[in-house]
């Protein structure tokens, strides 16, 4: 019978080492009697443990890269969709939630007039603003190009959600000088509230997008809620 234990120890000079302790128990004849005898083997496995940890970190990094937009480090479209589907499955009865679609106004014109490096600055500004306004505890994604989304799984106050969306637009307009544009960068926002506007990702996405389209058609640089259009 045997068992093995790996533990970290500290040497006299302060270095950390990982040691594997393997204990084997066998029955041997001692003084004409059959008695259990333990044999302990100690092996330095520091290199092996550190290599496994390094591989684990690399695998985690690769998984994270596959889940995120390479420029902004926000969730990419596929991951965002999967996250929202998971969160919708755990929604309690009577719980309200919101899907917020954000789309930059005249973004092609920004790229054409100022160049793609300024367009990239605008994209990064939006991603940073979304993190600042909504925090790191909710799902925020870049759905592609100049399209972003936020999913709020537990909405208590819809006016507060509108206020946050207004704050996003306000902060974006203030980025003009930092980005290097002659006019204020703006965006349009469409909001779908669940469960009445939808109970699936597809329903919420399309209804927030319909509200967004209404803003784009009428005035831009504003917010529309699906149930009110």
What are the residue ranges of the model-derived segments?
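Conserved long alpha-helical elements within nucleotide-processing catalytic cores of c-di-GMP signaling
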Residues: 63, 67, 76-98, 105-135, ...
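Short beta-strand edge/capping elements of PAS-family sensory modules
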Residues: 34-38, 79, 96, 221
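PAS-associated C-terminal cap
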Residues: 43-57
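Cyclic nucleotide signaling catalytic output domains
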Residues: 140, 167, 181-182, 188-196, ...
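PAS-family sensory domains
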Residues: 5-16, 24
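PAS/PAC or PAS-like capping segment
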Residues: 44-46, 104-105, 155, 229
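Sensory beta-strand/linker motifs that couple input domains to effectors
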Residues: 41, 100
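Short loop/turn elements at sensory-signaling interfaces that couple input to output
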Residues: 21-38
């Amino acid at each position: 019978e045997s068992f093995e234990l790996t533990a970290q120890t500290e040497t006299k000079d302060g270095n950390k080492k990982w040691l594997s302790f393997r204990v084997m128990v066998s029955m041997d004849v001692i003084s004409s009697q059959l008695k259990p005898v333990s044999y302990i083997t100690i092996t330095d496995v520091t290199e092996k443990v550190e290599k496994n940890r390094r591989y684990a970190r690399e695998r985690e990094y690769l998984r994270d890269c596959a889940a995120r937009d390479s420029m902004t480090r926000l969730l990419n479209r596929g991951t965002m969709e999967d996250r929202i589907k998971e969160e919708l499955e755990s929604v309690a009865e009577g719980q309200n939630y919101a899907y917020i679609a954000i789309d930059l106004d005249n973004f092609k014109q920004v790229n054409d007039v100022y160049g793609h490096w300024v367009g990239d600055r605008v994209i990064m500004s939006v991603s940073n603003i979304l993190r600042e306004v909504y925090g790191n505890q909710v799902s925020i994604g870049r759905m592609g190009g100049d399209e972003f989304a936020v999913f709020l799984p537990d909405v208590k106050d819809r006016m507060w959600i509108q206020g946050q969306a207004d704050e996003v637009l306000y902060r974006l307009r203030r980025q003009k000088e930092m980005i290097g544009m002659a006019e204020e960068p703006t965006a349009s926002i469409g909001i779908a509230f669940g469960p009445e506007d939808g109970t699936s990702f597809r329903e919420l996405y399309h209804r927030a997008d319909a509200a967004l389209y209404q803003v784009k058609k009428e005035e831009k640089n504003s917010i529309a809620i699906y149930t009110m259009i």
